[in-house]
Structure formats: structure tokens, C-alpha cells
């Protein structure tokens, strides 16, 4: 919209105009060379100008051809003929992986089905397997086993004695339930150590 200018002997004026709501704007005096805001060209950087000056159609295509749409698309060749050797190889690998994944899933499903079916062992078999384990462990070196057990029991006895000393010295004022249970096992530990030492 062009701004309506009025000129007289006193200078140049922007004429009074009516607003959309019906009120009137005053006429304003304008200096020489003044350009109203609406008429100032919008700044465009060089990239915007470049893209505006660029044709919208690809090179070699006229506007008449584009508007009628008479240009024919070249027929696409088969995907297999355009793929390179490595692309074909990769396609084969992907297909192979898909097949293997499907097979793996089937095997996994079958395995889960087998796990759901509980095959119960008979008590005789359980006893035989546990006896076999115990027999093989004890047949290796019974003296070494007993020595190891004595060592562990002495360690426990030492811990009980240290706990008793802490209680007697007042370091532990109120022993916990577990500590009291540990103290009560002292006699049983001593008896077990004596029995094992006699067997050696």
C-alpha cells in the first residue's frame, strides 16, 4: 500500500487516514528523502539473494515441459543389476542372519519347552549322586580334610574368645543376639575340636 502524500507550500505531508476502528490518524509532516517503513525494502543477505536468483527448474527443463509434464522418467533397472559386488554380498549376509536368527529362536523355544517339563529324579538317584560326591571328596585325602576342619574350628573359637574379652573389658556393653549365640557355641566348638584331634 502506497502512502498518500500531500504537498503544499509549507512542505510534504502524509495525509490523514482512517483506522479500521473508525478513528482518524493526524496528518504528519515528512522531511525530504523520507521513506515510510512499509516502503523500505526488506534486507536480504547474499545467500537469500542467491537462492532467489536460482531457477526453480533443473537445467535443461523448460517451463512449458514442466507445466505439461510430458517428460518421461527413465525406467528403473532391476535392483540386482545396479548393486555392487559388496552390496550384493551384504544382502546375502543379512538374509543368512535372518535365517539363523529364526532357527535360533526355534531352538530357544524348544529348549524352554523342555525346561518346563520337569523330569523328577527318584530319591535313590539323588542319594547315589550325593554319596558319590561325598565319597570322592573324602577319598582324596581324609587327613587333610580333618586338618582343614580343625583349623576352621580353631578360628571360630578364637573369634569367640576375642568377643568374650571385649565384653569383659566393657568395650561391648550390650552384646547383640548373634553375639550371645556365638558365645553359647564355645563349648560345642571345643568338644568338636577335641573329637577331630583324637581321630587324627
UniProtKB/Swiss-Prot annotation:
- From the UniProt record, give one GO term of the biological process aspect: exon-exon junction complex disassembly
The Gene Ontology terms for molecular function here are: ribosome binding
What does the UniProt keyword field contain? Coiled coil, Cytoplasm, Nonsense-mediated mRNA decay, Nucleus, Translation regulation
**By its UniProt entry, which SUPFAM superfamilies does this protein fall under?**
Pym (Within the bgcn gene intron protein, WIBG), N-terminal domain
Q: Which Pfam families match?
A: Mago-bind
The biased composition feature labelled Basic and acidic residues covers 97-118
Q: Which domain of life is it from?
A: Eukaryota
Query: One Gene Ontology cellular component annotation?
Result: nucleoplasm
Query: Which spans of this chain does the record mark as coiled coil?
Result: 84-200
Region labeled Disordered — which residues?
Answer: 1-30, 52-147
InterPro entries per record: PYM1, WIBG_mago-bd, WIBG_N_sf
SMART domains in UniProt:
Mago-bind
Biased composition, Polar residues: where in the chain? 64-85, 119-141
The record's subcellular locations are: Cytoplasm; Nucleus, Nucleolus; Nucleus, Nucleoplasm
The role this protein plays is: Key regulator of the exon junction complex (EJC), a multiprotein complex that associates immediately upstream of the exon-exon junction on mRNAs and serves as a positional landmark for the intron exon structure of genes and directs post-transcriptional processes in the cytoplasm such as mRNA export, nonsense-mediated mRNA decay (NMD) or translation. Acts as an EJC disassembly factor, allowing translation-dependent EJC removal and recycling by disrupting mature EJC from spliced mRNAs.
Quaternary structure per UniProt? Interacts (via N-terminus) with magoh and rbm8a; the interaction is direct. Associates (eIF2A-like region) with the 40S ribosomal subunit and the 48S preinitiation complex.
Give the family, as the similarity comment puts it: Belongs to the pym family.
Query: Under which name does UniProt file this protein?
Result: Partner of Y14 and mago
Q: Source species, please?
A: Xenopus tropicalis
Amino acid at each position: 500500500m502506497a502512502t498518500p502524500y500531500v504537498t503544499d507550500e509549507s512542505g510534504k505531508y502524509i495525509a490523514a487516514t482512517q483506522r479500521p476502528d473508525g478513528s482518524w490518524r493526524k496528518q504528519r509532516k515528512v522531511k525530504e528523502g523520507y521513506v515510510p517503513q512499509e516502503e523500505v525494502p526488506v534486507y536480504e543477505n547474499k545467500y537469500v539473494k542467491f537462492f532467489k536468483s536460482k531457477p526453480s527448474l533443473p537445467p535443461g527443463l523448460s517451463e512449458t515441459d514442466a507445466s505439461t509434464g510430458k517428460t518421461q522418467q527413465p525406467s528403473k533397472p532391476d535392483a540386482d543389476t545396479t548393486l555392487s559386488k559388496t552390496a550384493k554380498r551384504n544382502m546375502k549376509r543379512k538374509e543368512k542372519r535372518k535365517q539363523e536368527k529364526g532357527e535360533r529362536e526355534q531352538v530357544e523355544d524348544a529348549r524352554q519347552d523342555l525346561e518346563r517339563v520337569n523330569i523328577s529324579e527318584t530319591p535313590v538317584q539323588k542319594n547315589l549322586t550325593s554319596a558319590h560326591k561325598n565319597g570322592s571328596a573324602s577319598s582324596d585325602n581324609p587327613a587333610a580334610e580333618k586338618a582343614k576342619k580343625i583349623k576352621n574350628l580353631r578360628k571360630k573359637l578364637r573369634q569367640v574368645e576375642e568377643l568374650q574379652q571385649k565384653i569383659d573389658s566393657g568395650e561391648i556393653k550390650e552384646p547383640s543376639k548373634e553375639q550371645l549365640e556365638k558365645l553359647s557355641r564355645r563349648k560345642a566348638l571345643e568338644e568338636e575340636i577335641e573329637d577331630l584331634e583324637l581321630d587324627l
